[in-house]
Swiss-Prot record:
Its main location: plastid. PANTHER family: GEO12009P1, THIOREDOXIN M5, CHLOROPLASTIC. This is Thioredoxin M-type, chloroplastic. CDD domains: TRX_family. Disulfide bonds join C89-C92. It comes from Zea mays. Signal peptide: none annotated. InterPro entries: Thioredoxin (IPR005746), Thioredoxin-like_sf (IPR036249), Thioredoxin_CS (IPR017937), Thioredoxin_domain (IPR013766). Residues 1-53 form a transit peptide. The gene is TRM1. Pfam families: Thioredoxin. One of its GO terms (cellular component) is chloroplast. GO terms for molecular function: protein-disulfide reductase activity.
């Protein structure tokens, strides 16, 4: 269905005589009759429109380090959840999918970052990180709370809800 819609939009907005070709592999496309519900005169007067739009909000975990820390965390207007982790840490691998889900669930409301403590030891030592995984919540460039260990998603959602509800 999505491919059919995108192809229909391409067919409507492709310039007449265009040498561009749509490569579709072995996909079966709808008939020409199904693609041309509008008259030629009407197609020519239509303004192009966007068929697909991406979300403006970041819905994935962003990697923070010593170079981008101030811009990503300290200057962020929305609350920021920061996970301190290391690749060799078993509990860190357990909580990583939870942090990924939270980034998607709260896209536009919070920013989720992760800091590899092996790659950015100065950031970790600045905030007294001695155990991983550790999750810190920042709001207005200020550390508000911390959670140590691989905790359930419900613990983190309760914490996040506390900070996205207040200004």
């Amino acid at each position: 269905m999505a491919m059919e819609t995108c192809f229909r939009a391409w067919a409507l907005h492709a310039p007449a005589g265009s040498k561009d070709r749509l490569l579709v592999g072995n996909l079966v496309l709808p008939s020409k009759r199904a693609l041309a519900p509008l008259s030629v005169g009407r197609v020519a007067t239509r303004r192009p429109r966007h068929v697909c739009q991406s979300k403006n909000a970041v819905d994935e975990v962003v990697v923070a380090d010593e170079k981008n820390w101030d811009g990503l965390v300290m200057a962020c207007e929305t609350p920021v959840l920061v996970e301190f982790w290391a690749p060799w840490c078993g509990p860190c691998r357990m909580i990583a999918p939870v942090i990924d889900e939270l980034a998607k669930d709260y896209a536009g409301k919070i920013t989720c970052c992760k800091v590899n403590t092996d790659d950015s030891p100065n950031v970790a030592s600045t905030y007294g990180i001695r155990s991983i995984p550790t999750v810190l919540i920042f709001k207005g460039g200020e550390k508000k709370e911390s959670v140590i260990g691989a905790v359930p998603k419900s613990t983190l959602t309760t914490l996040i809800d506390k900070y996205i509800g207040s200004s």
